[in-house]
């Protein structure tokens, strides 16, 4: 099962469908299922499909009205943080609201916020950027960076 992936990465869904002929890979769309691909197995019965990780979702195999178990994928937003002197440069992909935390007395405390790509002038210290999760994306926290 794919499990977890960074936004924009390609993941490989693999499985075994020997004897099913032409099965369908389906993707959840709200409460419905849509065909993502018609699968043809190799001679050993295995298949492989590459799909972009653009939002958390579920996949399943279907054949002649029967569906297999669901496999979930949690997509984590990319959070890139750079320190440039007293400026914290942040890029969250896809563009999502983010919180800038500063390490104070051994605790992370919020000091700023932004959405997508933004910069903040901040005092010296250790900072990180956190993105809250929702139904489409898992939560993410950047590595700490230091400003001088």
Where does each model-flagged region fall?
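Low-complexity, Ser/Thr/Pro-rich intrinsically disordered linker/stalk segments at domain junctions
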Residues: 1-148
């Amino acid at each position: 099962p794919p499990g977890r992936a960074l936004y924009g990465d390609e993941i490989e869904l693999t499985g075994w469908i020997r004897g099913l002929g032409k099965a369908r890979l389906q993707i959840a769309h709200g409460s419905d299922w849509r065909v993502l691909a018609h699968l043809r197995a190799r001679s050993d019965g295995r298949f492989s499909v590459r799909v972009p990780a653009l939002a958390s979702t579920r996949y399943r195999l279907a054949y002649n009205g029967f569906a297999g178990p669901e496999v979930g994928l949690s997509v984590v937003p990319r959070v890139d943080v750079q320190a440039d002197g007293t400026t914290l440069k942040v890029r969250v992909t896809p563009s999502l609201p983010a919180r800038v935390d500063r390490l104070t007395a051994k605790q992370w405390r919020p000091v700023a916020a932004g959405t997508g790509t933004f910069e903040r002038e901040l005092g010296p210290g250790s900072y990180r950027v956190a993105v809250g999760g929702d139904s489409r994306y898992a939560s993410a926290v950047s590595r700490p960076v230091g400003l001088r």
